[in-house]
Amino acid sequence: MTLKMDRKALKEEKKKQKLEKFLNKKTTQSKISKAPKPAKNKSSSGYDPMPVEQKWNNYWLSNNLFEPQERSNKFVMCMPPPNITGSLHIGHSMMIAIQDAICRYMRLINYEVLYLPGTDHAGIATQTVVMKQLEKEKKTYNRESFLEATWKWKENYGSRILDQFKRLGTSADFSRQKFTMDAGMNKAVTEAFCSLYEKGLIYRDNKIVNWCCKLQTTLSDIEIDYLSVGKNTILKIDGRDYEFGVIYVFKYPVKFVKDGYESEGHIEVATTRPETILGDVALCANPKDARYTKYDKIIPRNPITEEELSFVFDEAAEMDLESGVLKITPAHDPIDFEIGKKNNLKNIKIFDNQNKIIIEGNYYKLKRLDARDLVVQTLKNKNLFVEKKPYEQVLPMCSRSSDLLEPVIKEQWWCSCSEMAKKAIDAVKTEQIKIYPEESKDDWYRWFENPRDWCLSRQLWWGHRIPAYKTPDGVWTIARNKEQAIQSYKKNNPLNVHYQESDFVQDEDVLDTWFSSGLWPFATLGWPNKNQDLDKYFPTSLLETGKDILFFWVGRMVMMSLELTGKVPFKKVLLHGIVRDAYGRKMSKSLGNVIDPIHVIDGASIETLLDALKLGNLTKENLINAESAVKKDFINGITVCGADALRFTLLSYMNGINDIKLDIERVKGNRKFCNKIWNAALFVKKIVDEIISSDSLSYQDLLNLDLSNEDDKLLVWLIQERNKVISTTHKAFKEYKFMSAVQSIHQFFLYDFCDVYIEIVKKIKTKKYIQACFMVLIDSIKIFSPYMPFITEEIYSQFFDNSLMYTSYPEIIHNKFSTNFKSTLSKIKAIRADIEKYGKEKVDVILDGCECFDKIDIQFISILIPNINTIKFGEGYEVKKVN
């Protein structure tokens, strides 16, 4: 399939053309100019994306065209590394469509572009899916065998993800691809941890963490799903059904002391978690609450253990909520923990790692929610139960296991964020970093003005082991390796120099995944080593990512880069919205509602879509729901759309940080639009080759058309509309308004170039009109190429030997003339509306003689409305059917 038609070639003319091409071509590295072009396919009337995409992917990659080409201006972007938990989904395709469009555009405006790809080890996410897979296969495993299985998983899915990148047309430099657990990344992680520790920013402490019993690890905030629970809702937790969406009110026995007199009574306290009464150490009221501040002293007792409790005051207590008094359980609630720290309260831990009660007595070894029932019954027996009321609540759930998370105190490694956060705020305020869209800056400030310290420890096997070594005396030594740890410890602890190497045991925990990915912009360039790439390409130019990880990832990259390199990691941040399914849910592998971009590119039957769900790690319930949704939404499967149509569609949705509900029908529509581009190019190729054949000209000769002094009304209009598209797309890229860019070129090409200009050229084949037609086709495919790289490269290759990627973006043509051709088009639109009732029957048109139309306008109107029989001027406007 090709546009290229056989033509006679004269030897001398060929030599002349080659010389002209050499003189006119922009300077590129020799490997680009020498890159052999792929063979052209046989002609076909329709565009078939599959062979074209395969051909050009092979060509680009085999000729290393995605590697940076030396230029004075640099543009560097790191790809947010997708997790190796499975295949890419449409959300990743959105990311690639945006980033790759930017990179391809920057090449066209003569920038040296480095686009760095990679993948993330995704600690907890990967460990979860690999364990599920091993359990499916009924395999037993220890840490060593598990890690072996996980590396195999990485090789399988990591390579699959990279293949998907390439199928999407991603112009990243794959010779520099990184993985967050590569040896180089491991060195960077170790150096970063040790450096931050030496700066006093990393410490070990007992604090509240989110504990997942099913996975036996702490979680980061992004791994928590907050479930809104309605009143009196039954949920299956810890293996059985329990009631949630209720609040309990109990009476706490209290002594009130005022002016030396004591009185006894009760304070009613509301809680959604009666089981935690076992760990209560205090009650708390607001310092402005006169009901309690009037007493000299309040002495409560725990209604279960009957131990004496403290009574404290804190603004966290809301005066208008029930009695205005909170129960304080510092070991199992983050707010209570902070109140406990302020008031020097003790921490009573009541759950073990299996969420079972560890306090001796009637509740010992009970599951937490079974203990809840017993606590309620006990307080009923003591006449201390007041009521149970319906209550809407929010529950923290593990996004990986769907377990109800338990706040617990654990000794972990922490990173102090307060000082680093101030630097991150300052970097944005001083515009060292610009955030797009601008409204996201408010979220940035809000988050960094109240930063929480970062829990770094994870009780996992898959990840970067924490470079901390413990000796029998309980001392932790932070070091870059065991040998350094031994030397450091013995220097600081001379009394224990007898410790052997085996006495230094490395922490079993691994670091939070976000720690390694927080180093991504500079570690991918070789940090902590000093090298040419780091000097040349850091800081990077732009970080483009989803709005949902602005703080979890972007913020941490900024903090760590400023602290470890003294520089911002990137100069700009661009955020995009989240791609959601037809029901508004975020696409998630665990829900099974993801769309594989390859299914859209290559097409997929309903059977293929259903089989793909079964290959995942879905729960039985999620599998049933996912299958039902697929059968409803894709009963006939997905037709072949191609990568260009998918990319173009995704960019057409890109409007700030608004979320996106992808409609596959829209992708199919743009697949047809690709065919429109193809057929337009076919026509232009045909008429251009006729001139070349008759006049012995080259394609470059035909592009050497000076329209700056052209006064032909049609050409002046074409120049103006072309110029508008160039200006609009430049502005859109500058402001990252991709919806505006794709709409602009789509409307121009379809409605102005195809529906008007080409239709006129079919009837009026002057050389100048054909030359302009050729010029605008080439300009259009250059403008299309950042969004549709495959079809545009294929079309361009039919005329020229160099890659479209390393040409130049079209420039504005400055033409001083004006034209009334838009009035002609408006009249055509009005006539079409008036003759619609006559169908395809011939009509006579009378134009008002007062309107400014000439013979050329009449000719254009006749061409563009083929069912006009006659057209003439009269005293008024009229359309009538031919008798």
UniProtKB/Swiss-Prot annotation:
- Its main subcellular localisation, reduced to a broad class, is cytoplasm
The motif 'HIGH' region: which residues?
A: 82-92
Q: Does the keyword Ligase apply?
A: yes
SUPFAM superfamilies, sorted: Anticodon-binding domain of a subclass of class I aminoacyl-tRNA synthetases, Nucleotidylyl transferase, ValRS/IleRS/LeuRS editing domain
Any one cellular component term from GO for this entry?
A: cytosol
Q: Which residues bind ATP?
A: 589
Q: Does the keyword Nucleotide-binding apply?
A: yes
Group of enzyme by EC: ligase
Instruction: Please tell me the species this chain comes from.
Output: Vairimorpha ceranae (strain BRL01) (Microsporidian parasite)
Q: What is its EC number?
A: 6.1.1.9
- Compositional bias (Basic and acidic residues): 1-23
The entry assigns this protein to a family as follows: Belongs to the class-I aminoacyl-tRNA synthetase family.
InterPro entries (UniProt xref): aa-tRNA-synth_I_CS, aa-tRNA-synth_Ia, Anticodon_Ia_Val, M/V/L/I-tRNA-synth_anticd-bd, Rossmann-like_a/b/a_fold, tRNAsynth_Ia_anticodon-bd, Val/Leu/Ile-tRNA-synth_edit, Valyl-tRNA_ligase
Positions with biased composition (Low complexity): 30-45
Q: What protein does this entry describe?
A: Probable valine--tRNA ligase, cytoplasmic
GO biological process, any: valyl-tRNA aminoacylation
Which Pfam families would you find in this protein's record? Anticodon_1 (PF08264), tRNA-synt_1 (PF00133)
In the record, what terms sit under GO molecular function?
Answer: aminoacyl-tRNA deacylase activity; ATP binding; valine-tRNA ligase activity
Short sequence motif 'KMSKS' region: positions: 586-590
Cystine pairs annotated here are none
Q: Where in the cell is it found?
A: Cytoplasm
Question: What keywords were assigned to this record?
Answer: Aminoacyl-tRNA synthetase, ATP-binding, Cytoplasm, Ligase, Nucleotide-binding, Protein biosynthesis
Q: Which reaction does it catalyse?
A: tRNA(Val) + L-valine + ATP = L-valyl-tRNA(Val) + AMP + diphosphate
Segments of this protein annotated with the region Disordered: 1-49
| Record-linked CDD domains | Anticodon_Ia_Val, ValRS_core
